[in-house]
Regions:
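Primarily the active-site beta-strand->alpha-helix module of PP2C/PPM metal-dependent phosphatases
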Residues: 104, 110-174, 276
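Conserved subregion of the PPM/PP2C metallophosphatase catalytic domain
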Residues: 1-74, 78, 82-85, 110-118, ...
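Membrane-proximal, non-transmembrane interaction regions of membrane/secretory-pathway proteins
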Residues: 78, 99-101
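Preference for bulky hydrophobic residues occupying beta-strand positions
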Residues: 95, 122-125, 200
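A short, Trp-centered hydrophobic/proline-enriched beta-strand micro-motif
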Residues: 89-97
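Portal/gating segments that form or line small-molecule/metal binding sites
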Residues: 87, 103
Length: 347
């Protein structure tokens, strides 16, 4: 295995050798001193070869650095937005994402699925913006969720933990970006910084509970595709403080064979050259006609159709998360007028 010190020595030595060859030729070779056409052609060929060698060496060095940066970014992505297991508590899972930046592996979309004593808990969110600032916000929200999902018995308490974690992160960022405040945190976080967040809880009976802060509602696939509910979401986290009362929305039950599709607004907002939005619901309805839906197959189909629709990378990051109920049965409950009718429960 080549050592880093040897690589650095080689990277410095080769340009030095090429430069020494050019200077030696110019100063010591009699042919370089002549003024006739043949001598000039030979001199031009020598310096062209030297220049080409230098360019190729720099190109190889840049490609090597790019590979290393992508490896580091991929490792960071797997830690931050770690790959989901294929199955959690009888639910089949798959997730996919498309970045608005070519070659990028990190962005402002976030998702996680964890099995807890309170049921399977799911988060999907979208940070306003891109780049390193968005990645730091994703880390703050996801880190808080991974702890709060196990610790807190109710979804509203999980959401309040996310709000506090986001507030701390934004205040620390503001203090770091504006150190003139003498170490005193600003009174308000960064302006126009917010995160849309969707929290779901799926219990052992398939019952779905939700809290939504400005995020698109999931689609339920059961022979067709329709929004899980039409309830009014709360404002995104960071834009306004959460209200004192956080009512949990009951969204019916996820029956065996049915699937939920969570997504960020980059899916619905993607447009073609004519400005037509991507028909996400129609694509999902087409996939739902032949149950059971394959989570991985659905991810591939939607991403392929989206790229075909736009003809290029989407203008915004887009993420998709699919959960299919593979449980063999759901315990009997009291009859419900409509198994998917939204109901409100206090939280």
């Amino acid at each position: 295995m080549e050592r880093p010190g040897a690589r650095r020595l080689l990277s410095l030595g080769l340009p030095t050798v090429w430069g020494a060859v050019a200077i030696t030729y110019k100063l010591a070779c009699p042919l370089a001193q002549e003024e006739n056409m043949g001598a000039r052609i030979v001199s031009s060929a020598v310096f062209f070869a030297v220049g080409t060698g230098l360019i190729l060496h720099v190109r190889r060095a840049l490609l090597r650095e790019l590979r290393q940066m992508r490896e580091v970014a991929g490792a960071a992505q797997n830690v931050l937005l770690r790959p989901l297991p294929s199955r959690v508590e009888g639910l089949a899972l798959a997730a996919g994402r498309l970045s608005a930046s070519r070659g990028a592996s990190v962005g402002g979309d976030l998702y996680e699925v964890v099995a807890t004593d309170h049921g399977v808990r799911v988060v999907m969110g979208d940070v306003r913006g891109h780049g390193l600032a968005a990645i730091g916000t994703v880390a703050a929200v996801l880190g808080s969720f991974r702890e709060a999902a196990h610790d807190e018995p109710e979804l509203p308490l999980v959401l309040r933990r996310l709000e506090r974690a986001l507030g701390r992160h934004l205040r620390e960022r503001a203090r770091a970006e504006h150190p003139a405040g003498g170490g005193t945190p600003p009174e308000t976080p960064l302006a126009e910084e917010f995160v849309t967040v969707l929290l779901l809880e799926i219990d052992g009976d398939g019952g779905i509970s939700a809290l939504n802060c400005g995020h698109p509602w999931p689609h339920l696939l059961s022979g067709t595709a329709r929004p899980l509910t039409d309830g009014e979401p709360l404002p995104p986290l960071g834009s306004f403080p959460l209200p004192a009362d956080l009512p949990v929305l009951g969204c019916g039950r996820l029956l065996p064979g049915e699937a939920l599709v969570l997504h960020t607004d980059g899916m619905e907002d993607a447009r073609d050259v004519a400005g037509t939005f991507f028909p996400l619901r129609a694509v999902l309805a087409e996939a739902a006609r032949v149950p059971p839906v394959s989570p991985q197959g659905l991810i591939r189909a939607v991403c392929t159709r989206l790229l075909r629709h736009t003809g290029r990378l989407p203008a915004d990051d887009a993420a998709l998360l699919v959960l299919r109920n593979d449980r063999s049965r759901i315990p009997l409950q009291q009859p419900e007028p409509d198994r998917h009718a939204p109901t409100m429960s206090g939280g």
